[in-house]
């Protein structure tokens, strides 16, 4: 009788635990359900599918966002899921909320503007891949197990490969193949490094106390090799130096709304994994501040100087994203709560800036038929309001007032300076110097677009189409937060400061 009662109690506890896990994973379950509905709708209905597919997609995203708002108040602290394979907390919830908002912006942009962008909603393939990417990125932010991290990254990667080459064209197919080859190599390297860590620690679970204890016992060279191999895969998804070569071709070839997604969601998901990995796999034998500092300096410098010579705006923003990856890494190496909060604030503003930039580029692409900077000559005379909007976005990407881009870089540099004063490590001072110099360099290529818009002569060959009011309104809605958060960023800073980053690092 006693044994039966114990079994009944154990079963009840397991069911309760499973119920809690399913509640915590409801946003991801919603994404999966939306994905399945998109496929079924596409199979059942053969004509005029765009309205139905768009309704399913936006309702799914809206419901997932509502669930995330509820979870923000339900999970103020960190909670383990699925036996410790996943970890939910306010930081992962905030990141997932940003991903959902970003995906919604990309889909609205695809629906409202640009050449042949409504093809997104004529069949489910692109939408299914985008929702698959969103699902993988969501699990990346919650993963506490090396195997789950690998699977999540692969889901994001496979969807990205398909999205790059899904449209017709030799250039697009070439970019997709190049992305696939580089991604396969990076995944293999990362998996090999994970196998080393598993061999040394006997565990794949980052939350396992034995994992952290075993890390400190690994000799310097094997530990260094393991970490370099694993970080290689993470850096590839972040798009930082030296695994950034795929970015320009992919950005140029993929549809503009898809590029907007590529430029933000996989990067921020990878950043969350790097943050967790660096804080857990800590050892006196690995000076993360030096290694990540070198990567940050190289990413900022290579990205900015390469962008100077670009004639295509999407390739220019690809190199710009490499430079921004360097700035995102700076927040990690500060190793302070202020640095972590600055990193998250910068990441949030980066999301807003990039989606605004790519939407406006998409509008100009509709008028010129290309994304060449030369073809933007004089368009400021015909499209003055949209040109002013893109000027504001370029100022924000540079990191100048009166935009939130200035606040973001100010917080990053302030956190870096505080960390330098605390530890007096020379590498931190060098990063600060290079960061300031690279900000000056970025000014030259970011303002090249407004220069061509306002100070160059309009080509007679370009026929300007009537700009729809919805383009003006949507562009304004995307740019306005960049101005408002410059003057009133305190509420968002308070939101970021409410996150306990120590709870997010599994112990």
Predicted regions and their residues:
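Alpha-helical transmembrane segments of multi-pass membrane proteins predominantly involved
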Residues: 2-507
